Amino acid sequence: MRDLYLVDGYNVIFWVPDVFGRDDLESSRKKLIDLLQDYGAHNNIEMIVVFDGMGTSTKVKQEVLSDSFAIVFTPSRMTADSYIEKESYIRRNEYRSIYVVTSDGPEQSQVLGNGSYRVAVDDLMWSLKHDKKDQHTFIKKNNQTNRRSEIGHSLPPSVQEKLDKLRGKK
């Protein structure tokens, strides 16, 4: 059983405009989705990122990008907050833990009543930043240890000596 993160997408974008900007919502959404996909995959977390549909439809639009990542646009008369509150209640027995990412105070209070955990946007951003550092450290470490894998190092010492003699090293 794994964890589920329900993320209020626009709340995250507008909470940290220095990271996402406010001029182009499409590129801000794309950047947030990329960061969350990477974080979720690296930490085995299921993610649902919810955006207010703002008058676009009368039905929920869901785009499933993988078995552990989905994007939801709410219908015109439903806010991301109400969708997240409903989903956190409906899914409460399907996951080990449900985390709701928002810095909206009333929404945080509501989801706590459903048994979910709240994650402030600042805390999520800290986790994303440190997870990225951990990934870079892991990659750098593995690249250094695997940089050159010579077959000679895996040969028995007696064979290595004979090869060295043939090359004139001993």
What are these regions (language model features)?
Residues 2-5, 11-170:
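Nuclease catalytic cores that cleave nucleic-acid phosphodiester bonds
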